[in-house]
UniProtKB/Swiss-Prot annotation:
BP-aspect Gene Ontology terms: ubiquitin-dependent protein catabolic process via the N-end rule pathway
Protein name (database record): Aspartate/glutamate leucyltransferase
Enzyme class: transferase
Keyword entries, A-Z: Acyltransferase, Cytoplasm, Transferase
Gene from which this protein is expressed: bpt
Length: 258
């Protein structure tokens, strides 16, 4: 019998299931487990190839007749916020982001639960319990952090701590960028456009860290849930031939491969 090292990834294919993004279609995924001493290196490599992480699993679409899911990453150092995005930054000037270890809290879960109940009541995560949430945050063998976004308080300049929790981002730190694994926000703060604000904040953080990219996951043209990811330009989109650059003008060009 062939023996496989714990650090050698084994890939599996899921059975077809209804697509959550495009009505009338079915999805399949190829996945592997991110475990062992080289989990971080493997996560970097697979993310470069269009995979996403969910807990200790890396996956990517492997649908039979559809290629609508396109992995995208923002070119952080060249990004320039649009007029609308600058307004969102100004609207959230009273918000600070606190980088923390990937440790779940009851306060986070309260916001998470409110977000699901308002935004994704019938989605696949709708029934997640506090233990499920804890697993989502803690079950990681890679460099994962939590960013808590809080309203700035009178002592924030001294303590670095904000007041009430507004939003949370679960983020992986890769060798070439930040990967936004999952984010959520207080639904009663819709006017702040906190989802957009968190992406803009990640772009700024990547710049400060000297990291070239922010990985947003899958852009799906025509999907109300995923189409927004195409607004952050310039960005690169993964095609069969490699990463293709899309400029603010909408023009595209094949990027040199690393």
């Amino acid at each position: 019998m062939t023996q496989h090292s714990r650090d050698t990834p084994q890939f599996y294919l899921t059975a077809p299931s209804p697509c959550p993004y495009l009505p009338g279609r079915h999805e399949r995924k190829v996945f592997t487990h991110l475990v062992g001493g080289k989990a971080g290196e493997l996560n970097d490599l697979l993310t470069h190839g269009g995979f996403r992480r969910s807990q200790s699993i890396a996956y990517r679409p492997a649908c039979d007749q559809c290629r609508a899911c396109v992995s995208v990453r923002v070119v952080a150092n060249e990004f320039r916020a649009s007029r609308g995005q600058r307004k969102i930054l100004a609207r959230n000037a009273d918000v600070i982001g606190e980088l923390r270890s990937a440790v779940p809290t009851s306060e986070q879960y309260s916001v998470f639960r409110a977000y699901l109940d308002r935004r994704h009541r019938h989605g696949g995560m709708a029934d997640m319990t506090v233990l499920d949430y804890a697993m989502m945050v803690e079950d990681s063998h890679v460099k994962t952090r939590i960013i808590e976004y809080r309203r700035r308080g009178p002592d924030s300049g001294i303590t670095g701590r904000g007041e009430d929790l507004l939003a949370v981002a679960l983020t992986d730190i890769l060798n070439d960028g930040l990967s936004m694994v999952y984010s959520f926000f207080e639904p009663g703060e819709d006017s702040r456009s906190l989802g957009t604000f968190m992406i803009l904040d990640h772009i700024a953080r990547a710049r400060r860290l000297g990291l070239p990219y922010v990985y947003l996951g899958y852009w799906i043209e025509g999907s109300k849930k995923m189409d927004y990811k195409g607004r952050y330009l310039p960005q690169q989109r993964l095609a069969p031939s490699g990463w293709i650059r899309v400029d603010a003008s909408g023009e595209s060009a094949v990027e040199p491969q690393d």
